[in-house]
């Protein structure tokens, strides 16, 4: 089964970044509304590695027909809302299974 991964929201905690982070030359270039399709639980091209590592378990579970994470967490049992591990620039992703039910 395939999964649709949608960038829902991104933010930047500028105060934390200025206080704790070393300057970086390239920040996240994902855009709100951007969509990725995971085929059979595989990492979609163009999705950053950090984000993938945060959502991989959920995508693989949905792709194999599972769901209902944390006993009723999501209104749609075949979905999850996950954020990447970047504490300075977190990005929230909505993941949902598509295709076969």
Q: For the regions a protein language model found, what residue spans apply to each?
A:
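Short, compact, well-ordered microdomains
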Residues: 55-101
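A short beta-strand micro-motif
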Residues: 3-10
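Intrinsic-disorder/low-complexity, polar/charged segments enriched in Ser/Thr/Lys/Arg/Asp/Glu/Gln
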Residues: 2, 35-37, 90-92
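Short, low-complexity N-terminal intrinsically disordered segments enriched in polar/charged residues
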Residues: 1-2, 14
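Short loop/turn segments at secondary-structure transitions that flank enzyme active sites
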Residues: 11-13, 42-44, 101
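Short, flexible N-terminal segments of the mature chain
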Residues: 19-43
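Short, Lys/Arg- and Gly-enriched loop/turn segments at beta-strand edges
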Residues: 43-53
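Short, structured beta-strand/loop micro-motifs enriched in basic residues and often containing a Trp
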Residues: 10-22
